Swiss-Prot record:
GO terms for biological process: chromatin organization; protein deubiquitination; proteolysis. This is Ubiquitin carboxyl-terminal hydrolase 22-A. It is an enzyme of class 3 (hydrolase). The keyword Transcription applies.
Amino acid sequence: MSPAGCSHVNSFKVENWKQNLRVIYQCFVWSGTPETRKRKAKSCICHMCGAHLNRLHSCLYCVFFGCFTKKHIHEHAKNKRHNLAIDLLYGGIYCFMCQDYIYDKDMEQVAKEEQRKAWKLQVFSPALVSPYQYTMTGVGEKYSTWEPTKRELELLQHNPKRRKITTNCTIGLRGLINLGNTCFMNCIVQALTHTPLLRDFFLSDRHKCEMQSPNSCLVCEMSTLFQEFYSGHRSPHIPYRLLHLVWTHARHLAGYEQQDAHEFLIAALDVLHRHCKGDDNGKKANNPNHCNCIIDQIFTGGLQSDVTCQVCHGVSTTIDPFWDISLDLPGSSTPFWPLSPGSDAGVVNGESHVSGTTTLTDCLRRFTRPEHLGSSAKIKCSGCHSYQESTKQLTMKKLPIVACFHLKRFEHSAKLRRKITTYVSFPLELDMTPFMASSKESRMNGQYQQPSDSLHNDNKYSLFAVVNHQGTLESGHYTSFIRQHKDQWFKCDDAIITKASIKDVLDSEGYLLFYHKQFLEYE
């Protein structure tokens, strides 16, 4: 939003402009009574395409509603030279000359007054309002969630024929047609569409497309995809537009040959991140990628690297953003740890097998343990001012809301190409506290103690999706397990969705593991 104000509002501020603006806020934005809500639901459709969504805006000069996403309100502004419009969801004023939402003290005062009037007509409970809602009103005020009146409750009871969201509801479960070796894409789409915060973002129509051609925007297509998944339809969806856009924006994935699901995940997040730039709310980002787009809010964490000089023990620290954590496995050519007694390793038909039990926690311990860099990798120490041997240790500086663990099952080198089939046991609930940089610093200072419940909870995760690969490096197939509601699991094999048990999930090989934070704090 432009902080300096806008001179173009003067053309609107003519006789009775405040009254006209009040009518728009009362009838089509804040809607404080059942009558105005009915009027808004009936009247607020795009006058060009008839859509209810797509960020409807109302012209301030005439009676016209148009889609912001599809640029219909832009066409009206250009043809009629009506340069101001109001966002019917949040109440912000947009200037087509400035190409930005603008601030005007007088207009904001009208908006606040009409919003307060609307509150008085509703049952308002501050406890029901989340800080997230507080940041999205557009005028810096809170608003309440809908509370049905006694009459509305009676109407709901007398009209039972409606779709109910229950614990056994299958809304959100939908197969995907394999378009020719596209199982790598289908399994990632299943994981993303069942990521709770990502689902809430797209189903609330929060994306603000700023691309010249929305048809080339991957975020717009993902928004459509979420609408398809949660529409209640059960027939398999054909993701041909998604595949086309992926090929367009990630050329290395184009073609019908087999691709890697992990590579697709990172490419998809990268393109979504780039196409989400218009969704940044302008607030200071609280993640290492310094971006407030929905992708970085959910998936970005901070990895701390501490390099310690072996002579002066000086520490050089860097923090890098990450979207996933790639973990080495026993049986790879990368040194891991001595095999436990009774374990054995071998290679059969190009696949590496290791007997014995390895856990996800073991892999994380290995990932965060100090590593001696050796004489061939000396670095210049800022304390000694000379090249010295050092040790390097990785820890988690900031955890993402969704943590994705990539088990490195495919090994490619000049001499070797193989798949590692080592079984890795992974839990339904994961505590990342031992792998935090703060835990390491406490131990080094001799102050380590059992973390408090609140700190402990901040680092707790629950499993919600697993991607698996069956077959060999040369020929294989991807499937996924996804969690629906609290404890229902389903196996997604392209177009086929079947119910699965928790045992099925935990006994699977595991290639990509998706965990969601159990407790979230609004920032």
